[in-house]
Amino acid sequence: MNATSSELLMLNFDVIFIELDPVKRAALLAEYYAEDCLWIHPGGRIVGREGINEAATEIRKHFPEYRYTVTSEIQTMHNVATCRWGSGMPGQPFHYTGTDFLEKRDGHVSRLYTFIDQQLFWS
């Protein structure tokens, strides 16, 4: 699949980061993320699909039923997409909100930057 940067950003919210099964998520990461991908978030830097899968597994342990909702228009420029989002229980107010910037290279996510508005479990 040669997805656009905005499509890859939506896959993060709708599929990858809500997947509870680490094996299924690993397959999704292999399909959509570059091998040397980088995720920078309030807790630090994670390099590679395996590290991102481990971090996503930890997030799902804390918030297994939470879903992500895009709350702004997705803006794109060149191979970068960005948007604001919120996360929480379906039908409830958001527990936390943030902004993501995603960079695409050769059809895959190469970099993901996550800014979170509230302090969570990362210190």
Predicted regions and their residues:
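Short acidic-aromatic low-complexity motifs
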Residues: 2-35
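Short, positively charged
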Residues: 3-5, 76-83
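A solvent-exposed, acidic/Ser-Thr-rich amphipathic alpha-helical stretch
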Residues: 26-79
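Short hydrophobic/aromatic-rich beta-strand segments that constitute the beta-sheet cores
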Residues: 39, 83, 111-112
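Short, surface-exposed coil-to-beta transition loops
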Residues: 67-69, 94-100
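Short glycine/serine/proline-enriched coil/turn segments at secondary-structure junctions
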Residues: 77, 90-94
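Short beta-strand segments that buttress and anchor functional surface loops
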Residues: 83-90
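Short beta-strand edge/turn micro-motifs at domain boundaries
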Residues: 97-123
